[in-house]
């Protein structure tokens, strides 16, 4: 039988995500909690020896069922053109190590489709990271939209799969993975350009950078000079070379207020010169 749709029906087909009912399903307090607890959206997932393989769906089972029911009910009465698709433009994972760089181990991360029993990487998008490579950013881009259906007893959707290899002798957490994505749901689908999985190695954070600036060194030297109870020695505004390895025999050039020749203050200035402490 030919489809007997109205203009309102066609408007609804353009994007089911504009429906108030669907918004309530996606952003209810329960759905938000499930996204955190079941999917680890925006949370740190610890890779341990007793959790060597982690499969995290991008949609909680309860939310998946409600979304699928919403689209199916609209499809059955002719208001929607399909039973719904899940679209994920990109999945971004931030990976950090929690053990020494000497630990021999690696992580294998990829995006899979729960409709595939083998859980193979989608379009070969898979990234391997050795422990000494971390920290790193990893990204995946699915090339198709996933139908909101049930295959056997599995709710079909995309999932992040993380495998831990090696790390002999390390039973605790060896790496932390924080994944972020934004799932979209619509009655229409598409195919997308194949892009290889991205892997960007990140320089470790230098938390001592702020403490080794010349201003910090100058403050430390000033406090040391104040301890000798000599009010005539003033730190200069000259930049301090913090990269130089200064020995105890090297002297710090300081300026003092001008004094009259032959005065007692001038003689004390020449008799005492503070030294830079090695190891600043």
From Swiss-Prot:
- Which region ranges are annotated with the description Disordered? 248-267
Q: Cite the record's Low complexity compositional bias ranges.
A: 255-267
The record ties this protein, via Pfam families, to: 3A
Name a biological process GO annotation: transport of virus in host, cell to cell
> Which GO cellular component terms, listed alphabetically, does the Swiss-Prot or TrEMBL entry include?
host cell plasmodesma
Key words of the record: Host cell junction, Transport, Viral movement protein
Q: Where in the cell is it found?
A: Host cell junction, Host plasmodesma
Q: Record keywords: Calcium included?
A: no
Report the InterPro entries cross-referenced here.
MPV
- The family this protein is said to belong to: Belongs to the cucumovirus movement protein family.
What this chain does, per the entry, is described as: Transports viral genome to neighboring plant cells directly through plasmosdesmata, without any budding. The movement protein allows efficient cell to cell propagation, by bypassing the host cell wall barrier. Acts by forming a tubular structure at the host plasmodesmata, enlarging it enough to allow free passage of virion capsids.
Output this protein's name: Movement protein
> Which organism does this sequence originate in?
Cucumber mosaic virus (strain Kor)
């Amino acid at each position: 039988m030919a489809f007997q749709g109205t203009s309102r029906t066609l408007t609804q087909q353009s994007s089911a995500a504009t429906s108030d009912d669907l918004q309530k399903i996606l952003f209810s307090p329960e759905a938000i909690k499930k996204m955190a607890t079941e999917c680890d959206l925006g949370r740190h997932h610890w890779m341990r020896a007793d959790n060597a393989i982690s499969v995290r769906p991008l949609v909680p089972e309860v939310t998946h069922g409600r979304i699928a029911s919403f689209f199916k009910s609209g499809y059955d009465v002719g208001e929607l053109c399909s039973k719904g698709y899940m679209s994920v433009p990109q999945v971004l994972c931030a990976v950090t190590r929690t053990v020494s760089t000497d630990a021999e181990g690696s992580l294998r991360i990829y995006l899979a489709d729960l409709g595939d029993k083998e859980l193979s990487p989608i379009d070969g998008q898979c990234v391997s990271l050795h422990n000494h490579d971390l920290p790193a950013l990893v990204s995946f881009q699915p090339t198709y939209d996933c139908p909101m259906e049930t295959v056997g007893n599995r709710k079909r959707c995309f999932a992040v799969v993380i495998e831990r290899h090696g790390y002999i002798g390390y039973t605790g957490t060896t790496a932390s993975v924080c994944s972020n994505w934004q799932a979209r749901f619509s009655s229409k689908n598409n195919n997308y350009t194949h892009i290889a999985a991205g892997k960007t190695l990140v320089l470790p954070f230098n938390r001592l950078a702020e403490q080794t600036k010349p201003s910090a060194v100058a403050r430390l030297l000033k406090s040391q000079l104040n301890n000798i109870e000599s009010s005539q020695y003033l730190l200069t505004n000259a930049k301090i070379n913090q990269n130089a390895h200064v020995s105890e025999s090297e002297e710090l050039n300081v300026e003092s207020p001008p004094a009259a020749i032959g005065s007692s203050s001038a003689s004390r200035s020449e008799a005492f010169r503070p030294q830079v402490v090695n190891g600043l």
